[in-house]
Amino acid sequence: TMQLSERGKLDRKTFDRGMGVIISESSRLTSIVEELLDFSRIQSGRMKLIKEKLDILAEFDDAVYFLKERAVTEGKHLLYDEPEVVYPAVYGDKNRLKQVFLNVLDNALKYTPKGGVVAAQVIYSKDEPDIIKIVITDTGCGISAEDLPKVKEKFYKANQTVGGSGIGLAVADEIMNLHNGSLDIESGEGVGTTVT
């Protein structure tokens, strides 16, 4: 890029666009390497959680906010109304939990077409005081009945046309297990997906 720029054959717009692609691809590759390292740590029992008392709602809000602009840029609707209820503090690793939130929201946006909707909500009931549910539903392509049981397996990708390593949900599932939680997925081909 530098040689072309020095010779004056590359206009500013093309240069900026090229740099944008380079930065985007660098981020994507870094993300894949981080997922592989996380999965390796989980498999070898070396993943350490830094558990602390945290506001789970604030962590989820940050994840939604982080992806909101991307949704707008891609012509998708990311819907989330922050609950007005005060939630009890949770004891967990805020960075790892946020990683799960970002992974699931990212997948929902990735597999939802332009004009589609990704809706997120946080559910807490005093009837189940030890459970906080975060539900993310999309109007994307969905997952076939054949593929659904396999989506949390490492390197499994139901849809080969969309980028990614195929280990994000496997890592997210393991992180939730380490927090005594679960990652439940309901889906149907052509009807979207719900992750709780």
Task: Tell where the protein language model's regions lie, with residue ranges.
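Short conserved segment of the HATPase_c
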Residues: 143-155
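A conserved beta-strand-to-alpha-helix junction within the catalytic ATP-binding
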Residues: 50-65, 98
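Short conserved segments within the C-terminal catalytic ATPase subdomain
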Residues: 70-81
